[in-house]
């Protein structure tokens, strides 16, 4: 019986013949290229595992770091760790050997785990984005650690329910030699296409739309606030001076209103969103083409494109901990604490001693830049 796909690249369609001859993946990439890709993949696995493990360890060991936003970031890091352990190694072996060596049952399980952990990471990023929207645009800071834990638990359950059909509904499975990766593949069954579209919409298009709207609103709010503060800063300061009976004195210098604590965390999440979009847009388009285009699915370039787009989704797991250490000072300092002294090449920069607690605080003009 020929193998096409239902929702997975390795699932069978009983009544559909294959129009083109299978490809031998051992000749899809040259041996030197496969070795280079394997080395890069191993480095990606190491960075994704160690970097995200440090993030989780920091939040676990330091009670001061267990804020709502850090709990969410730790959950995002944990989902990336699971990807690096249960999905990325098998992709590396497939690239080296040119075939799937782990059996059809594990291929189903592997596909389910891939979507499970990806959905969880996307759900956490969506929660963080909506939280930033509520704080900056709506002036509502309602997410505390307890509520964050509830939302994390709910996101795990929802992600599991969405990814579960990938492994429950398909029992007759074989791994085609032409593309032994468990990805969405061509199907003519309406139910399978509906599930595939639902999966891609849940993973990319809904989160992307909601986050894009949130960030556009946030950017507009920050811009309007900056203009308003700049316009009224001088009059506010002069009003304070007049109360002291000092109107005859020289006008004070323009006060510097600190908006950094309000925007820096948002900027970090915006960078994560941009990384998510760049890494997942190609794979989402690729997956939809695989489901609906027989010509594309059986083209000679399918395996190469599939490998590249899959790699991009893995890169997100590698970049996230790098972004945390780059953008979040407390994470950077904690990372330096975990590193041996001989590897501490970054200079110790004295940080500010205070930080604001509630991001929805209204700012007023002051003589010194406020601490973050």
From Swiss-Prot:
Superkingdom of the source species: Eukaryota
A single GO cellular-component term on record: plasma membrane
GO terms classed as biological process: G protein-coupled receptor signaling pathway
Signal peptide: none
InterPro entries reported for this sequence: GPC_Orphan_Receptors (IPR051880), GPCR_Rhodpsn (IPR000276), GPCR_Rhodpsn_7TM (IPR017452)
Keyword tags: Cell membrane, G-protein coupled receptor, Glycoprotein, Membrane, Receptor, Transducer, Transmembrane, Transmembrane helix
Major localisation: membrane
Cytoplasmic side stretches: 60-80, 130-149, 220-268, 325-372
Tissue and organ distribution: Ubiquitously expressed.
Membrane spanning residue stretches: 39-59, 81-101, 109-129, 150-170, 199-219, 269-289, 302-324
PANTHER family noted in UniProt: G-PROTEIN COUPLED RECEPTOR, G-PROTEIN COUPLED RECEPTOR 45-RELATED
Family: Belongs to the G-protein coupled receptor 1 family.
Job description of the protein: Highly selective receptor for lysophosphatidic acid (LPA), a mediator of diverse cellular activities.
Protein name according to UniProt: High-affinity lysophosphatidic acid receptor
Originating organism: Xenopus laevis (African clawed frog)
